[in-house]
Every structure is written in structure tokens, then in C-alpha cells.
Amino acid sequence: MISAILLAAGESKRIPLENKLIKSFKGKPLINHILKSLIKSKVNRIIIVLGYEHIKVKKILLKSTKIILIRNKNYKKGISSSIKYGLKKITKKNKGFMITHSDMPLIKSSHINKIYVSLLKKNNLVHVMKYKNRIGNPIGF
């Protein structure tokens, strides 16, 4: 089993007065672009870590049996606190997991599947996406 931790707890401080995750991008909430890609991918479970405005974000999320919602009440402590909350849901059944940000609307299920396959082949390495020689997210472990 490979799980994905989708980080969705931040305060969106760079966009004042709005939560960017619920803001519309190409006709749907920003978070639902990456979520749709995760749902369509081979990933077995999607652990969504909510925090800031968790009720508003939860209301607009796509639905799937793959999704597990958790709430980071300490989201103001930063991204590492959300990663820790997500990691608590990774079990021994997992051969690997990936961490992705929820504000990445251009990530497709094919990108996620590349990390998924790579994790199954060599799960003792860190797996990253690369574009034009730049390393980025999502990251697999």
C-alpha cells in the first residue's frame, strides 16, 4: 500500500483575506485539482491534513473512499506539525508514502503514478519529481 499525505492546514498568509484552497481556479476549488489527481492515481489512501478553516475546506472537498480526514489543531506551528499529524496515519502496511501540497493544480495522476511505481520498486530511497533539472513536489518516501 502507498499512501499520500495531502497538506491542507496552512493559513494562506500570502493571499490575504482568502483561503487559497477554497478559491476557484479554472472553475473549481484549488485543492480539488490535486485531490482529483490523487483520487484517479494508483495511491491507495489519501490522508488530508486540515487545519486553518477546516470546516470550510472540508465542505468543498471531493469525496472518495480513499480519503481519510484529520485535523491539525496546531497548524500555526507550521508545515512540520502537519507532516507529523499525517505520518501518524502511516501504518506498517504502507510500503511507502508521498507528501504533497494542496496548492499544486498542475500535478496530474500520471505524475503521482510515477512516484507510486518508483516507491514500489525501491522503497528505501527518497523519490522526487524533476522538471527542467529542478526538484519539486510531490516527494515519496
Where are these regions (language model features)?
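Structural beta-sheet core signal
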Residues: 4-6, 47-48, 98-99
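Short, well-formed alpha-helical segments that are part of the catalytic scaffolds
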Residues: 20-21, 27-39
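Hydrophobic packing residues within well-ordered alpha-helices of enzyme cores
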Residues: 15, 57-61, 115
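Conserved beta-strand scaffold positions in the cores of enzyme catalytic domains, especially
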Residues: 22, 69, 126-128
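A short, conserved beta-strand element in the Rossmann-like catalytic core
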Residues: 12, 56, 105-106
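Conserved beta-loop-beta/alpha segment of the NTase-like Rossmann-fold superfamily
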Residues: 76-137, 141
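Conserved N-terminal catalytic core of the sugar/cofactor nucleotidyltransferase
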Residues: 33-96, 109
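N-terminal nucleotide-binding beta1-loop-alpha1 segment
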Residues: 1-16
